[in-house]
């Protein structure tokens, strides 16, 4: 069945009959295969997929013949299809029994295909040629141009060990995680929130000593009263930092009596709430003289400041009055001091001016006297010269 793979020299029109006639002659030169066509785009498929498709298209052909033709054409789909069609047409006139008998013989394979398949590095030693994967399961041969094979991504292991190591370290770098943050981290406390909402239009007040809690009423009157209270508390806090004002408060008998009443009220309320606190209060008040012996000034000042924390409304009013009186006194003292300094500076300037006048006057008198004494001497000299 060598005529299945050879083309007679009589032309393309009688190719089938000429091939059948020349089957007995073994000296006919093999003609060119059907894959010598004008240059066109070569389509390649995956090997197993192409073999399955060709077996479906040519069920009468043997699997080994299809594989040999495909390998001879280096996986070119169009050339393989043309050659298989030509072989199928040429083998159509012959009987199936002869075809089956001669399919296993080496004479049924063209010598070109046989040479390529029987080379030392055959399919047993090397894998089949690489074919591009099929784009479609159906209609594989309908596409005019094949898709380009996808380029595999570059392997990281194959790169150099210089820069990639740093990149790998950078990729594997995990930032250190912080521990659990406190509950009040970046949070506004409720009292701060109330003060911000109440005083949104003005400057933000700080939490001064004795500052009352912010009222919930949104009215302008309440806001004004809060502002006044805040300013008064700030002034009182500043006054309490003045040692002279503190000494004046300790010398004021009425204020000390009111402060003592407030302290007793606070202690009675505290004793009602808990009986243990009463013993602590009495124990705290009894050793005051003992501590006063060690450092009486510090202990008295600390005790007085502790009493100021429990002031009532009446005592607070007295404190405001005393603070106003103290501020007026200090203003008067400052104005008197400025006045005295001004007078002293003016008196010093006048005295220096008088001293300068006296010095200049004495100098002028001496010059005038010296000139009067020199005048008659000059006249006598002139007369003698004449």
Swiss-Prot record:
CUE domain boundaries: 46-89
Biased composition (Gly residues): 11-27, 199-209
GO MF annotations, alphabetized: ubiquitin binding
Residues covered by region (Disordered): 1-40, 147-172, 195-225, 367-386
CDD domains for the chain: CUE_CUED1
A matching Pfam family: CUE
Composition skew (Low complexity), residue ranges: 1-10
PANTHER family: CUE DOMAIN CONTAINING PROTEIN 1 (PTHR13467), CUE DOMAIN-CONTAINING PROTEIN 1 (PTHR13467:SF3)
Descriptive protein name: CUE domain-containing protein 1
Organism, scientific name: Homo sapiens (Human)
